[in-house]
Amino acid sequence: MKREMKMNSSELIANKRKKLNLSVKELADALGLGVDGATNIRNWENGFGSPNKQILKKIEMFAETIPFEQNKTNYKFTFIDLFAGIGGIRIPFQELGGKCVFSSEWDKFSQKTYRINFGESPAGDITQIESSEIPDFDILLGGFPCQPFSQAGLHKGFEDTRGTLFFEIERILQDKRPKAFLLENVKQLKGHDGGKTFSTIMKHLDMLHYHAEAKVLRAADFGVPQIRERIYIVGFDRDRYEINDGYNFPFPKGVGNKTKVGDILEKDVDEKYTISDRLWQGHKRRKVENRKNGKGFGFSLFNAESPYTSTISARYYKDGSEALIEQKNENPRKLTPRECARLQGFPDDFIIPVSDAQAYKQFGNSVAVPVIREIAKSMINEMNNWE
């Protein structure tokens, strides 16, 4: 009987890996098995020992198909996913009937997460890809980095933005002429470089004959318990659509649901997420020092009843100070990668095939999916009304 259990678990693991095209390490990371996870998976798969009941249950519950594989024949519109990260912007547009015909992401760990969840490997550095290599499409999506324009406002042509990643968006808009676009950035973009960066972006989008509007939206207003304010720029091709001078894009106002941190917390959390005595004492000491020096307030502590957390960023993996969770009779703990995924509105069937450190970076760099979903609905509705 014992041998049968080993055979069953080894076959189960092998089948899961084969169906999802996962390496031993990718499956171990996705299951949260820690530093010895890959070795354990390899041993179990080869019939040496077997996982305990808790891990076996995790393996049994694990996906057997690519979670977000798109329908390549039945679709309503097409889009491309630039600076794609792990696909947070893609998910809602695909849900609404869109087909992704091209994606680009340079980070190899994000590429891995993207491939495993969507069944496609993004192209690499967009600066090395010619517009002619990109299929025609209807909507451009991109969460681009905020960079200064060295000569912003001094020229009348497109030299203002050359050498920045926004230039790559501009180049593709000019060459491919999609019907619409959605860009996402940090809310500080508006004030970056004294406002020159934002005004240059909007000026150049206008020069390309796109009607563009921008608005800062807060994730907590869209059903996820995280403040996370971001700026969203929506644009439509004026040469294709008759857009009145007084037109205002109907940015969504939110969904009105009250949020609570407890809604995204896992029930059974590994002790490894509890911060050490040394780190906790350091957090408290720095908080006192920062208050004295007027440099901010240091760590942020939340519990299940808190309406929302502060914004998680790519640096969350370092010490978790942005959002620590209270625990009874213990030091506080960091959010788990799955909790970070939920904080951004990612579905629970989204696979996390990387280490905790990489997962924190990926979700910290990603978007609040529910915000994108509501913007996408408004965009598609407007385009359908015009066509």
Model feature map: region roles:
Residues L12, S23-E26, I55:
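Residues that mark the N-terminal boundary/hinge immediately upstream of a DNA-recognition element
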Residues G32-S50:
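Recognition helix of helix-turn-helix/homeodomain-like DNA-binding domains
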Residues M1-L20:
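A short, Lys/Arg-rich alpha-helix, primarily the initiator
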